[in-house]
Amino acid sequence: MSKPLRIVFAGTPDFAAQHLAALLSSEHEVIAVYTQPDRPAGRGKKLTASPVKTIALEHNIPVYQPENFKSDEAKQALADLNADIMVVVAYGLLLPQAVLDTPKLGCINVHGSILPRWRGAAPIQRSIWAGDAETGVTIMQMDIGLDTGDMLKIATLPIDASDTSATMYDKLAKLGPVALVECLADIAAGTAIAIKQDDERANYAKKLSKEEARINWQDDAEHIERCVRAFNPWPMSHFEVAENSIKVWQSRVEASSHDAPAGTILKADKSGIYIATGHGCLVLEQIQIPGKKAMPVQDVLNARAAWFEVGSVLS
């Protein structure tokens, strides 16, 4: 049996916390945790600890929360830990080369896509947005580039037709910890194999924006439907009607032809709101009007039928 690793863990949100929890149940020793500084949250804007910090404190693990690693003090504090390896999961801080070089075995990262397909900030969302058949997690040896390091392990799973970014996030948060523990076992045993990425196959998964999430009815229905799922739970696909912003939580593509201008409401009843697009028809099934929770279209039509008159054209 190989010797347990002395691990420094760096991460911030719940996705990272689930990986930390797996490490705490493994043979390895988590000697310290790095996480983002406490941030104001909630209506009272009270300083709130990250999910990773919460778990670390529950297990009496030392917590470090530097704003960055520019100072000699921050770099020395990491060096003093004498870690074998640093595991980075959705940390949110850029790590300079000096930090990457500090642990004996360097730093590894759990990335939410099959590299090199989607590098960057929003790989889960972009995989749905692009219509990929599968996604997964890649564990890589970190280098100074953006998700360009050598790959140590890949675990995959299919993207179902009903998957949203929220459901994929949950699935990857279960897949990632298992892959991480398996990868660390290989590293500890000296059997891990590093595979270089093919840069020619790489795409940049840029951050999402509210502007991008505004529906363009000139797009084809299949693309809009993928956007609805990719942008759930944020920033939410939306459109304007009667000067109100309507968020779309669930939709489907109707395989029917039409010659109506894009944005035309073709039908509105309990089965959905049928809207002409640049190619095909999109059926809205669950939407959210201002001040209300998401609800089935039938409930919205009972109260706001005038907003969705057949023949009217959405901008």
From Swiss-Prot:
UniProt xrefs under CDD domains: FMT_core_Met-tRNA-FMT_N, Met_tRNA_FMT_C
Binding site for (6S)-5,6,7,8-tetrahydrofolate: S113, I114, L115, P116
Catalytic reactions on record: L-methionyl-tRNA(fMet) + (6R)-10-formyltetrahydrofolate = N-formyl-L-methionyl-tRNA(fMet) + (6S)-5,6,7,8-tetrahydrofolate + H(+)
Gene Ontology MF annotations: methionyl-tRNA formyltransferase activity
Enzyme class: transferase
Enzyme Commission number(s) from the entry: 2.1.2.9
Signal peptide: none
Residue stretches in coiled coil: none
GO cellular component: cytosol
A Pfam family annotated for this UniProt entry: Formyl_trans_N
Keyword Transferase set for record: yes
Keywords in alphabetical order: Protein biosynthesis, Transferase
UniProt keyword annotation of Protein biosynthesis present: yes
Its biological purpose: Attaches a formyl group to the free amino group of methionyl-tRNA(fMet). The formyl group appears to play a dual role in the initiator identity of N-formylmethionyl-tRNA by promoting its recognition by IF2 and preventing the misappropriation of this tRNA by the elongation apparatus.
UniProt family annotation: Belongs to the Fmt family.
Name recorded for this polypeptide: Methionyl-tRNA formyltransferase
